[in-house]
Amino acid sequence: LDSHKVSQYASVTDFLVSSAAQSSERKLERARKAVKSQLATKLDDVEVRYEYTTVFNGLSVEANYADLEAIQDLPGVKDAYVSQVYQLIEPVNETKLADSVPAIGGDISQKTGYTGKGMVVAILDTGLDTSHEAFRNAVNAPKFTKQDIADKLASDSLRVGNVNVKSIYQSDKIPFAYDYYDDDTNVSGGNSHGTHVAGIVGANSGQVTGVAPDAQLMIMKIFGDDGSGAYDSDIIAALEDAVVLGADAVNMSLGMTAGFSEAAATKTREVYQRVKNAGISLMCAAGNEYSSSYKSAGGTDLPLASNPDNGAVASPSTYDAALSVASMNNVKATAPYLLVGDRKIRYSDPAETASKQIASLNDTYEYVACGVGATSDFTGKTLTYKVALIQRAGEENGEILSFAQKEKNAKAAGAKAVIIYD
């Protein structure tokens, strides 16, 4: 909308509680009210979801796409565009905090006193398992108390529904938790990605320690429980509240490698710049698509030799205001192994079940070499309570021996388990 933005002033947090802020807010509210009145009288099926004041003066509405131009032409409307949708940045491999934090020097920073004490990080993600033991310990010198959050709710300056402090304040570790996607305070029902990210940032238990174990975490759920993407409208609402609440940093492990239309991207870039101007460190994932050929139809994830391509970086991490954070593979990983004498041999269990049967063996077994696992390879061999050691590939009766057939033959011969090697 056409009008001044509160974030144009020097200190956003201080300004928001001043008399000047109240005066500006009334002017901004009148501008939004005029536009809302026109939306209601000139268009059908329009619902206002959010009103923004801090990072920009505007509205988020649900309307028919056919009415976009009509909305753009309304008096007082500077621009209107369709909300962009971002996807999660999924990890390329499983990581363990015990190894990943030291891999980036997090343990060194903690030893020098940088533990996140007195700091608050807003995590815009899929939510959090609030009962997880990694977030149960009390915070040393928390920045926000329960009363602080209650005061913010009472000021009616947040973009949350009709909630009370009892439902939104989880603990001094998690002083704020809200689901912007579903407009409620249940942040525990989504993908575990958010809990994983929150653990990296601020886990603090006897088992795992994050980069900033003494930091408070504001959990701002912006993804649906079904894995659907995060909309700009919800993201901006969460960013507004992060500014109003006074977060020191914002973490967003989301992005879109291909980017968006120039008009929408320009407006979003301005919003992120104002968040930075408010003194907040804005950290966004660079993404894991090292090339625009990643997950392409070619099936190799590699570019053509005739078109070698360049690395691809996800938006919004490409905005000037954001610190683009690239991923790195963990230098260590835990893996199951078989112990043969003093030698540890890694293995992979391809079973698609939550409980791996091989783990239930828990004993010492003799192994017997059984060729490629054809029926004839078991002739004359005693396999009761023993493990069949079978080579990959091979044929039987002119047919290629599948893993399933090898296992079937071994079971018929009385084997306790099967190990297939290449």
Describe the residue ranges of each PLM region:
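N-terminal domain-start motif of subtilase-like serine proteases
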Residues: R49-E51, S60-Q72, E90-N140, Y178-H193, ...
